[in-house]
């Protein structure tokens, strides 16, 4: 059973359909876009004082907009959708870190 599954996957990878997919914007667009969530995830190790609230908000709006686009476009671009879901989560975490940092700077009453 596993051998048949591996053979089927290998046949698909060698197919013209797969090569066409690799040469399309449905593949390379999301690959290039993965830089945003990777950078956000990498920045989680850094101090929250470097987080830009405006940029975080803009990237949240951007990812929400393009999540919808990736879902609505035909054929659906699941790679782009996954990229924007990951970026949305990463940006929301960064936004939460910024809010916690700003709240901790305020003097308690």
UniProtKB/Swiss-Prot annotation:
Coiled coil: none
Keyword Isomerase: no
Mitochondrial intermembrane topological intervals: 42-52
Sites of N-acetylalanine modification: 2
A GO biological-process term: cellular response to leukemia inhibitory factor
One Gene Ontology term of the molecular function aspect: pyruvate transmembrane transporter activity
Transmembrane intervals: 21-41, 53-71
Residue numbers bearing the N6-acetyllysine modification: 72
Entry membrane topology: Multi-pass membrane protein
Subcellular location: Mitochondrion inner membrane
Chief location bin: mitochondrion
Catalytic reaction list: pyruvate(out) + H(+)(out) = pyruvate(in) + H(+)(in)
InterPro entries with a match to the protein in the record: MPC
Mitochondrial matrix side: 2-20, 72-109
Keywords, ordered alphabetically: Acetylation, Membrane, Mitochondrion, Mitochondrion inner membrane, Transmembrane, Transmembrane helix, Transport
GO cellular component, one term: mitochondrion
Family in the record: Belongs to the mitochondrial pyruvate carrier (MPC) (TC 2.A.105) family.
Assembly notes: Homodimer. Forms heterodimer with MPC2. The heterodimer is the more stable and dominant form.
Function: Mediates the uptake of pyruvate into mitochondria.
Name of the protein this chain belongs to: Mitochondrial pyruvate carrier 1
Organism: Mus musculus (Mouse)
